[in-house]
Amino acid sequence: MTIRYPNGKRYNQASQPQKTPIKTHTYSNRGMSLEEELNETNQYYLTHNIACVHKKPTPLQIVKVDYPARSAAVVKEAYFKQPSTTDYNGVYKGKYIDFEAKETKNKTSFPLQNFHLHQIEHMKQVVAHNGIAFVIIKFTLFDEFYLLDAKHIIAFWNRQNTGGRKSITKEEIEEHGSLLSCGYHPRIDYIRVLDMVYFS
């Protein structure tokens, strides 16, 4: 039997999109990207009226678009309109917060080449205006997360520029940063550390 849509188009069973399975969450969610984990955490904070933090959109200039079907558009070429600053920003307890999320597979250090000068300058500006700026670093091999204040990132960046190390050792991150606790909800509880570091 042939089934047709109201517009006369033939129904094709194979062309129907497959239902994506519902994600099941384990306690550790190993394999999840840091961005996914933070987005999930921020959604929890927003839903429970704890904080309002969002991922910043990346501004793109679309140059070329193909229309393989009348109702579909495929972007073929796009460029960044401007250099991005940091990944996330928002408000917590009346204070502006702004942070970058980075992950590394290195066991002993975090390479500073993962940062760009405009990101460092942006963090300096946030701090100069009494905002809270920091970086969340994930060591993927250990499934460990650290919150490191912008003043330390800036100091390590300056050290690199004066002939010093081009990375931050894990020991330095452990010394100057705060280990973030992980759980089910919120996944990465960075607000608890903000309370201890900035609001105590």
Curated annotation (Swiss-Prot):
Keyword flag Amino-acid biosynthesis? no
Q: Which UniProt keywords apply?
A: Cytoplasm, DNA damage, DNA recombination, DNA repair, Endonuclease, Hydrolase, Magnesium, Metal-binding, Nuclease
Q: Name one Pfam family in it.
A: RecU
Query: Where would you find this protein in the cell?
Result: Cytoplasm
Task: Please note every region of biased composition (Polar residues).
Answer: 10-25
Cofactor binding note: Binds 1 Mg(2+) ion per subunit.
Residues binding Mg(2+), per UniProt = 85, 87, 100, 119
Q: Give the span(s) annotated as Disordered.
A: 1-25
Which family is this protein grouped under?
Belongs to the RecU family.
Describe the function of this protein: Endonuclease that resolves Holliday junction intermediates in genetic recombination. Cleaves mobile four-strand junctions by introducing symmetrical nicks in paired strands. Promotes annealing of linear ssDNA with homologous dsDNA. Required for DNA repair, homologous recombination and chromosome segregation.
Q: What is this protein called?
A: Holliday junction resolvase RecU
Q: Which organism is it from?
A: Bacillus cereus (strain ATCC 14579 / DSM 31 / CCUG 7414 / JCM 2152 / NBRC 15305 / NCIMB 9373 / NCTC 2599 / NRRL B-3711)
